[in-house]
Amino acid sequence: PNPRLEEFDGKPAPFKLPNLERTPPGKIRKSPFTFRRYGESGIDVSEMFPHVARHVDDLCVIRSMVADNINHNGACLQMNTGEQTFSRPSMGSWLLYGLGTENQNLPGFVVVAPNQPAQGAPLWDSSFLPAAYQGTCVTDLKQPITNLANSSLDANSQRRQLDLLARLNRFHRNQSVSVDELDARIASFELAFRMQSAAPEAFDLSGESKITQELYGIDDTVTQTFGEQCLLARRLVERGVRVVQLYHNRSSTASGCQIWDQHSNLKMGLTNNCAASDQPIAGLLTDLK
């Protein structure tokens, strides 16, 4: 909570604001939600996150971060890469590059986003790092990796096909100045072949017990979507995937893709979003411990 908001609640801003012709500035408002301290750390948590509050001592809360860009694309890019205009490696790419992965049959960096957020793929891009370190985006948990299996070829035929493609790509690479994308393409073909057996099992949530699914809120329509994402994150991490990044943006409408970007009805919007994400996050923290 910001004590200055309490101090200036209902008053004009105590500093000069830019002249806005279309939208005149309103008065300062304090948060409509109450906060109280939790855990041995005494960290303030909003009443909207009662489940997460019980895990506050397991969290690293950083309140010193700032952003320089108020626009969707630039702000999202800065949050993920540290840069708001130029291409830079994403945080997930840096982690994968520095720490490697423990599973050679699944991507080392997986992004789960029912709908792509503002800016899209650059948020998990590897930029000047080798292309193999970019994230793999999953939008549909029921069909996580599109075109993964080739129903017209058996495994032996696919293996011969991949070997031929690899030879052709290596030949082309030897004639090319830029080899990074070709190396990544060769590696992606090999990974896709191995994923045909590993991915279906990893992404199948049906084998999880009823108790586990209830822990994540999958039995409740309010928390089901993000609960499934959080449960998938646990399954991927325990199988050696180094980085899993989740986006809470379940709607397919233009305004719904950025459901945390409320321009109006703030109290209702935040209440709905917190209700949909609180229990799944707490369930993941409980399960990881």
Regions found by a protein language model. Give the residues of each.
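Ligand-binding pockets and gating/stacking loops
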Residues: 1-289
